[in-house]
């Protein structure tokens, strides 16, 4: 049975001229493999406005699965996120100058939401293709976590049939020419996100395997 998968990526932020999350996601717009039929939308790196754009994308596409994607400069792996927390704590301003500190994303909402994606299975499938991947247990407190939490809150309140989650990706090589940081090719990132979409479309349940962090 076909599953429509909505992928979102952000516009550039923090002085960057490119955001690999959108560069990879837009490559997959219209792609189909197995039961996964992929559509892509860009969201702004702006608190609350990103959620408004996401809600409109949900209305437009009526997806079965939503995977939001964001850049995590400094990471060297594809990292599906385990948990979103109800906190905006911005170290830098967003693209419209907003810099909330100690603010709830959803007043009265739960402290956190778990992902709705089979993230351990996604990690294993990505690693089978020789692409580095690992489960992450923190999505930060900037717009990525904001969108992740907002997505799961929206699903919980209004779209219980949708499964959703968030994946962080590294820089691409062109972003690291003037700084020392790990990167991954755009081809590898795009391939990994396609694997994630197909895996989520095929499997609702995750695998039982060891993981976690010691600190």
Swiss-Prot record:
Source organism of this protein record: Bacillus amyloliquefaciens
Name of this protein: Pyrrolidone-carboxylate peptidase
Source domain of life: Bacteria
Similarity comment: Belongs to the peptidase C15 family.
Gene3D superfamilies: Peptidase C15, pyroglutamyl peptidase I-like
Protease as UniProt keyword: yes
PROSITE patterns in alphabetical order: PYRASE_CYS, PYRASE_GLU
GO biological process, one term: proteolysis
HAMAP family: Pyrrolid_peptidase
